[in-house]
Curated annotation (Swiss-Prot):
Disulfide bonds: none annotated. GO terms for molecular function: acyl carrier activity; phosphopantetheine binding. 4'-phosphopantetheine is transferred from CoA to a specific serine of apo-ACP by acpS. This modification is essential for activity because fatty acids are bound in thioester linkage to the sulfhydryl of the prosthetic group. Residues 1-54 form a transit peptide. GO terms for cellular component: chloroplast. InterPro entries: ACP, ACP-like_sf, ACP_chloroplastic, PKS_PP-bd, PP-bd_ACP, Ppantetheine_attach_site. SUPFAM superfamilies: ACP-like (SSF47336). This is Acyl carrier protein 5, chloroplastic. Disruption phenotype: No visible phenotype under normal growth conditions. It comes from Arabidopsis thaliana (Mouse-ear cress). GO terms for biological process: response to salt stress. The lineage of its organism: Eukaryota, Viridiplantae, Streptophyta, Embryophyta, Tracheophyta. The gene is ACP5. Its main location: plastid. It holds the Pfam family PP-binding.
Length: 139
């Protein structure tokens, strides 16, 4: 998670005046070069921003992966599994993850390299890898 801060300095003249810009903490600040009556400083904290990056995978692939994960982990129908759900959040250990990968390979008719399979931690990551492998298989 990234947090950013903003600092600003402003001075105002009663009449129009030429201005000079400079950067303070990567924010543009304007100073008036003429006589000024007002000088103000303000610091404000900006809201933290979270970025999410994901590839466009078919919703049906995500749904199939979710179903297989629920089946392999013996989850009830009321337990929600979304694209961002981590296997560890569902109580899966490394053996469970291997079983999930085996179920995915069987369902989609693909073979995952062990190194690539170890990188899968979420439903989204599994769906992305599956679509990539299916494309490679058909190409």
């Amino acid at each position: 998670m990234a947090t950013s801060f903003c600092s600003s300095i402003s001075m105002q003249a009663p009449f129009s005046a030429t201005t000079t810009r400079f950067c303070l903490n990567k924010q543009a600040t304007i100073f008036n070069n003429e006589k000024t009556n007002n000088l103000s400083f303000s610091l404000r904290r900006l809201m933290p921003a979270r970025l999410a990056v994901s590839c466009a995978v078919k919703q049906e692939t995500v749904e199939k992966v979710s179903e297989i994960v629920k089946k392999q982990l013996s989850l009830t129908d009321d337990q929600k599994v979304t694209a961002g759900t981590k296997f560890t959040e569902l109580g899966a250990d490394s053996l469970d993850t291997v079983e999930i990968v085996m179920g995915l390979e069987e369902e989609f008719g693909i073979t995952m390299a062990e190194e690539r399979a170890k990188e899968i931690a979420t439903v989204q990551q599994a769906a992305e890898l599956i679509e990539e492998l299916v494309q490679e298989k058909t190409a």
